[in-house]
């Protein structure tokens, strides 16, 4: 008997597979062998499909011997032709009611099976209006032009497929609607459908083509399968419709699990497998439910799952499978459940694509249908999505259709067999969907990381606020580097390092610098500026590279016992100077690189620390310890911290500098107001063309003279500590005279004009204090220190509620996270937070819009857009004629600078000369309320920029709130 035994291998998804393949071939225009033309437009098609779907085309094509004939359809509109093609290839088509009559007429003339009365399967009145069925009348939405003639009415096997229901679409009819066993959940389904209809419709509209392509084919196969199952299929479809769309086996096969089961026992096992697959998919969906792409599917699936659970009453088996699937579906909520359901209906091809299309129409129809369907007893009707009609109520099925569609379009080639339905397809879909979801989640996570790194960075260390300086760096100043190096270095964390290393450091010239660049030379409250200097110093180590010899050795800077301040570079107009610590540098040593004393920058001040320095570094991250964690005595720390902690101690500023070479020699001053206007000189590492002539020449002269410049920036402990000014050699002085813009040590020579820098989020201002060089060397330090003391770099451990001039702008997030609402000068402005990859939005800083390329910050997104368009990555084309170091790519910015900023500085310089002269040309810093320290710059002459006799220094001062 074993020899006589035969095994029947049944391909449950055979029809849907073939159909989906045709659809895919059509979409890709693969193996097309004929062309249909209407209204001057062409559609390529396959002779086999046309012949199978239309006796007219079959006869016509038999008479044609051309390899690729072209048929011009005279009285057919292109839109109708396309709809008929969709119908033939996908088994269904969505069309508005006003176009239905014309389509049916054209289909009649072309003898399209399923749309014309001449089909062997027996005809249903082509006009839905004529049909007495309630559904036909009620359907105002897209119609599924498949004749839903019940399998029984449909002359059953008479369909061209005759014996095999799967045989042809002409007999396409949704399983007889036993009428909804009444999807007990029809109301719920309706609700789901209603809620989902808009989304589904939108999705359907977008995917309608795809859906139509794959869904029609799948539907026809499914329908035939269902038809074969006959009334059972009808009941199952109704039950499935109650479960509704769990299977989303497009076309009436919704509950085809049952129909499939009824159709063949093999189908049942398949459906069982599908169910398991569906469950798996459901789990995947649960994971993926979060993805928006699945949202529509999720809604549908959820509805389906509910429908499945509730509507399953129709068929026990379906309920079992549906419930099993439905449970997961409901749990997952996304299409996977639907997919699983469709998989469950193994015999029935899950026509998810068709379902999707139907979804949009059937969602509406659902509402209508629930009423009409329940009342409709007649089996023959051209139903809107007739195959789904029952299912249509279950819009959920359509969700699966979407999924299936996606599969068909993208993966059909790879998994042609399973794309449409059946367990295989559902499994494939689930897997695909899962992957997609994970990808999306991953992307979202990445986005979040990109958006939030600042916050994280700021919060890494309990006691410190790390500031990534974006457009400004505290200017290191003649001021004492007073902070004990221990604290800064200790507090510094690697987190910034990682940030920096990730972001910008290519070679960490002195990786240790990062850890302890903060090496503060001496503790001094005034070191706030020093702190800035320290950060810069670390950079300068890099700058030292410019000087030339950075030895990546961590050895402390031993070249000079006295601290030297060297201009490392500038950010915007912010001049960055670095202090080369004296032997304190042992701590500095961690920072550093051996370089010329002048270039060597190992400075840790005020808890500011550079993560690393490298010749190729384009970004330096400055860490500022949180003043809260530090004693107020550490004014430097606090001062710096104030910047960081102004708003939560977690400011994250990106300080992007050109190569150390340019750091050292750029002579650009900073004006907070013009950050947006100024061009960051760091775009090119070493280009002299970016520097003023003086700066460029000084660049070379400085290297030779740096060593000669030894100024002791000895920080006297306490605010009263005396500061040694940098002593300039005669040669250096000569150079300064010749090169007005060069900073010797920390002092900016560019102009004697005082420069006031307002740091928006920081209770401090940076000003240029110009004093005679004589004063620099011999100036009583008390003058500079006292102001610092008064200003109290401490600034109350916490960022003061800075009420600086720039702080009049307040903003708050609106309920809609896509926008922010800003109120400035009693004016409200709403700004979209959507931005391109070149932009970073950081709500923690006053100027939240950051250029990802150069880290400049802007208050308004439009300003950043202009920057990206006109400035970013381009060398400046316009330079200030007054040699103040201002450079920009935008002519209007230069004009405004000359008319406002530069002129105002001259006036301020003139005004300050008098007070300054009274004080003996000693730099004086005056504490100003509102948490900002406004230094009074005593600029001696050189209003015209001829600062040959004077050198200017920048002091970063933080004022105590209490002050």
Swiss-Prot record:
BTB domain: which residues?
32-97
Q: Would you say which domain of life the source belongs to?
A: Eukaryota
Q: What is its main location?
A: nucleus
Tissue-level expression reads:
By stage 11, isoform Q, isoform P and isoform Z are expressed throughout the mesoderm. From stage 15, expression of isoform P expands to all tissues, whereas expression of isoform Z and isoform Q becomes restricted during later stages; starting from stage 14 to 16, isoform Z is expressed in muscle, and isoform Q and isoform Z are expressed in the CNS. For some isoforms, expression is also seen in specific types of cells in the embryo; isoform Z is expressed in the ventral furrow at stage 5, and isoform Q is expressed around the tracheal pits at stage 11.
Q: Which SUPFAM superfamilies match?
A: beta-beta-alpha zinc fingers, POZ domain
Q: Name one GO molecular function term.
A: DNA binding
**Zinc finger region(s), C2H2-type:** 849-871, 878-901
Question: What keywords appear on the UniProt entry?
Answer: Developmental protein, Differentiation, DNA-binding, Metal-binding, Neurogenesis, Nucleus, Repeat, Transcription, Transcription regulation, Zinc, Zinc-finger
Q: Which GO terms describe its cellular component?
A: nucleoplasm; nucleus
Per its UniProt record, what SMART domains does this chain match? Answer: BTB (SM00225)
One Pfam entry name: BTB
Segments of this protein annotated with the region Disordered: 115-200, 228-340, 447-469, 482-520, 900-963
Respond yes or no to whether keyword Transcription regulation is given for this record.
yes
Query: Bias category Basic and acidic residues: which stretches?
Result: 901-915
* PROSITE patterns (UniProt xref): BTB (PS50097), ZINC_FINGER_C2H2_2 (PS50157)
Per its database record, what is this protein's job?
Answer: Putative transcription factor required for axon growth and guidance in the central and peripheral nervous systems. Repels CNS axons away from the midline by promoting the expression of the midline repellent sli and its receptor robo.
Q: What is this protein called?
A: Longitudinals lacking protein, isoforms J/P/Q/S/Z
Q: Which organism is it from?
A: Drosophila melanogaster (Fruit fly)
